[in-house]
UniProtKB/Swiss-Prot annotation:
The keyword ATP-binding does not apply. GO terms for cellular component: cytosol. Specifically methylates the N7 position of guanine in position 518 of 16S rRNA. The gene is rsmG. This is Ribosomal RNA small subunit methyltransferase G.
C-alpha cells in the first residue's frame, strides 16, 4: 500500500484531466458493476489496482504512437492511458457486443469519442497496424503474441500487464517468441514513485 492515497496520486498525474478520469471511475463504479464488467469487491481499490496499474505503462509508450488495447473489456488500460496521454491515437479492440457497447457509451460521455475508436472483433481479425499493443488480464503471453503479432509494426512492441506469473509466462512463450524472432523482458514499473510496483512484459523484435 502507498503512504499517499491513490486518488491523490492520480490527481497529481492527471492534472487538468483529473475530472475526466474521475468521471470514468464513476462510470466503472456504477454502470461497470451493473453490467458485470467490474466486480463489486473492486470498487474500493479501483484507483490502485486498475487506474494506476494501467497508466504505469505510460512511460514505455513513445509520444504520438498508435496504440491498440486488445481485449479492452471495461476500457483498461486503454481509457486511462488515452485520458493521460492526449497525444496517443487509441483503438479499443473488444469482441463482446455488451462490452463494446459499454466502451462506446463511456467514450461518448467522457468526450473521447473523437480520438478513441472502438473496434468490435477479435484482435487477430482487426485490419489495423499500430506502434504499440497494450493488454491487461486478457490471455497468457504466448496466446497474446499469436493474436497480436500481425497488428504491430516492425519497430513496435507489445506491452502486457502481468502479475506474479510474468516470468513463468515468458518461459512458456519461448517457442512462440523464437518462431517469430521476438524477445521478451519483464519490467517492474510504477505510475508514480508513490504508487505500487506493476509488472509488465515487453515483447519486441529481437535486437530492437
Amino acid at each position: 500500500m502507498t503512504l499517499v492515497s491513490d486518488d491523490a496520486i492520480a490527481d497529481r498525474l492527471y492534472r487538468d484531466n483529473y475530472k475526466t478520469i474521475r468521471q470514468y471511475v464513476d462510470i466503472l463504479v456504477s454502470r461497470g458493476v451493473d453490467w458485470g464488467l467490474i466486480g463489486p469487491r473492486e470498487i474500493g481499490r479501483l484507483w490502485e489496482r486498475h487506474i494506476l496499474n494501467s497508466i504505469a505503462l505510460e512511460s514505455l509508450i513513445p509520444e504520438g504512437c498508435r496504440v491498440a488495447d486488445v481485449g479492452s473489456g471495461a476500457g483498461l488500460p486503454g481509457i486511462p492511458l488515452a485520458i493521460l496521454r492526449p497525444d496517443l491515437e487509441m483503438t479499443l479492440i473488444e469482441p463482446m457486443l455488451r462490452r463494446s457497447n459499454f466502451l462506446t457509451e463511456a467514450l461518448d460521455e467522457l468526450g473521447l469519442d473523437d480520438r478513441v475508436t472502438v473496434v468490435r472483433g477479435r484482435a487477430e481479425d482487426a485490419d489495423l497496424h499500430v506502434d504499440v499493443v497494450v493488454s491487461r488480464a486478457v490471455a497468457k503471453l504466448a496466446t497474446l503474441i499469436n493474436w497480436t503479432a500481425d497488428l504491430i509494426v516492425e519497430s513496435g512492441s507489445l506491452l502486457a500487464l502481468k502479475g506474479q506469473s510474468a516470468d513463468d509466462e515468458v518461459v512458456k512463450a519461448k517457442k512462440e517468441l523464437s518462431k517469430r524472432r521476438l524477445s521478451a523482458e519483464v519490467l517492474l514499473i510504477r505510475a508514480d514513485p508513490a504508487a505500487d510496483v506493476t509488472r509488465a512484459v515487453r515483447v519486441r523484435r529481437a535486437g530492437k
